Amino acid sequence: MSDRIRIADTKPYDVPSSLEALHGPGLGGVLHLGHEIIWAPHSQTIHLATLDDATFAYTAIINEATAADQERLLNKDLLLEVWPALTLPWRVYELWEERFPELPRNELSHAFLQR
């Protein structure tokens, strides 16, 4: 076992106050993300045309945004739909699923993380 400290072990992650506080656009909407959330070369505008678009955007928002930004950008119903498809650090799963037990589990990610 290594005593190495990784950024994933120390990086702070924010979590919104409640899922009901999430007021972002649903599928078909548009998100405008700042560089502090996503480093896109040309535009931080993401059209939520498909669940894949939402998965891409939500992964960045959950990993990088403040709780206030998460509440403004995320949509509860869309989050519940894409949560099992998100690829997140294990600490993020722990933080979010502890606070929001109604989130569906991503069994594949949890099986991998428990190794």
Give a label for each model feature.
Residues 1-115:
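Long, compositionally biased intrinsically disordered regulatory segments in eukaryotic proteins
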